[in-house]
């Protein structure tokens, strides 16, 4: 049971990280390797977006740490399908959170249902 709990925490962290990264980069101007990255005024004026991106990257790091615990307690063939749940959670969150403004379709929803069914098939007891 410990492995599934660590896996779920990892998946939730990845989901939050994806949402933060998406929000952060969408609210930044066009990304390029210009000198503006060294301009304090530019950095300060985009601090909220940059903090979101950094928090998203930190979320990925924490997720990997949790994933190591997942692998410690679960066989890989049971643990790895859990990662697919992040697709489901991200889809649900962008459907619920209006500022992402993403389209939800019947076909995409069917895909999410297939993912859930696949995770269930792989994870059930033998």
UniProtKB/Swiss-Prot annotation:
HAMAP family attached to this UniProt entry: Flippase_ArnF (MF_00538)
Domain of life the protein comes from: Bacteria
Similarity comment: Belongs to the ArnF family.
Function: Translocates 4-amino-4-deoxy-L-arabinose-phosphoundecaprenol (alpha-L-Ara4N-phosphoundecaprenol) from the cytoplasmic to the periplasmic side of the inner membrane.
Membrane protein topology class: Multi-pass membrane protein
GO molecular function: carbohydrate derivative transmembrane transporter activity
Keywords: Cell inner membrane, Cell membrane, Lipid A biosynthesis, Lipid biosynthesis, Lipid metabolism, Lipopolysaccharide biosynthesis, Membrane, Transmembrane, Transmembrane helix, Transport
Keyword Amino-acid biosynthesis: no
Pathway(s) served: Bacterial outer membrane biogenesis; lipopolysaccharide biosynthesis
The UniProt record lists the keyword Cell membrane: yes
Residue numbers on the Cytoplasmic membrane side: 1-4, 71-79, 124-126
Main location, first listed in the record: membrane
Organism of this sequence: Photorhabdus laumondii subsp. laumondii (strain DSM 15139 / CIP 105565 / TT01) (Photorhabdus luminescens subsp. laumondii)
Record-annotated membrane-spanning stretches: 5-25, 50-70, 80-100, 103-123
Localization terms from the record: Cell inner membrane
GO cellular component: plasma membrane
Periplasmic topological domain: 26-49, 101-102
The protein's assembly and partners: Heterodimer of ArnE and ArnF.
Single Gene Ontology BP annotation: lipid A biosynthetic process
Protein name per its UniProtKB record: Probable 4-amino-4-deoxy-L-arabinose-phosphoundecaprenol flippase subunit ArnF
Cysteine pairings via disulfide bonds: none
């Amino acid at each position: 049971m410990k492995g599934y709990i660590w896996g779920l925490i990892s998946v939730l962290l990845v989901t939050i990280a994806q949402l933060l990264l998406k929000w952060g980069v969408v609210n930044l101007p066009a990304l390029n390797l210009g000198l503006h990255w060294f301009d304090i005024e530019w950095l300060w004026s985009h601090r909220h977006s940059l903090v979101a991106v950094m928090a998203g990257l930190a979320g990925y790091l924490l997720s990997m740490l949790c994933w190591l615990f997942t692998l410690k307690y679960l066989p890989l063939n049971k643990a790895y399908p859990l990662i697919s749940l992040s697709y489901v959670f991200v889809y649900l969150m962008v459907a619920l959170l209006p500022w992402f403004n993403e389209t939800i379709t019947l076909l995409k929803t069917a895909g999410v249902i297939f993912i859930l069914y696949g995770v269930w098939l792989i994870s059930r007891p033998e």
